[in-house]
Amino acid sequence: MIVLVGYVLVGNILHLYLFPEQQVVKEAYPIVGDTMVNRFAKERYIVLKTDRETNGRYAEVELHLEPGGAIPEAHIHSNYDETFIVLQGELNLVIDGTELHLGPGEAHTVPKGTPHQPFNRGSREFVGIVRVNPPAQWALFITQFHGFLTEKQEPRNDFEFFLQAMLVSGFYGDTYLASPPISVQKALAFIVAPTARLLGYKSWKLENSLKWRR
């Protein structure tokens, strides 16, 4: 136990203070038109507006989900509300364990701090607008995380997903898994993040932004 505590403390001194992750460069921030494709989850995002276009009020993307597609994991945004607006097809939103069905012209806002996961259980492609208010680092986060999810020819396994989730939860500070409780995830991130860094994981990579640029 003493060895483990020492490893975690020394690891975090190295991770946070002596060798912190590089600050995100300007070129890595998403721009209008960036298009993220995650074939494993049958999803596609097109950036419509970032905080630069809205004077920091909100950010907006066009979301496409093929039949059977879904956002990879139920999750929580602690710093912003997220609104889903259906343009085409149908969207099923599981919100804190309750499933909501939305059709064309309908919209629903998920308040910050609420677990949620969108699905397309229909037989045709879903197309809709997703808007977050305030924008925080959401556009950068989805750009980078989808870059991570699609770096390999096969889907990320649960261990890889966990390591990255624990690392980025501390870096971005606004997106967490639906469970366990956020306080537990923050404690896990403190323990796990140094190991993730040691194994080569990064919260952001320039190439994970540029790959989506058209």
Where are these regions (language model features)?
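Structured binding elements
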Residues: F84
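Short amphipathic
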Residues: K49, E62-H64
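Jelly-roll (double-stranded beta-helix
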Residues: M1-A41, T50-Y58, G69-A74, Y80, ...
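A cytosolic small-molecule/anion-sensing beta-strand core signal
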Residues: L87-Q88
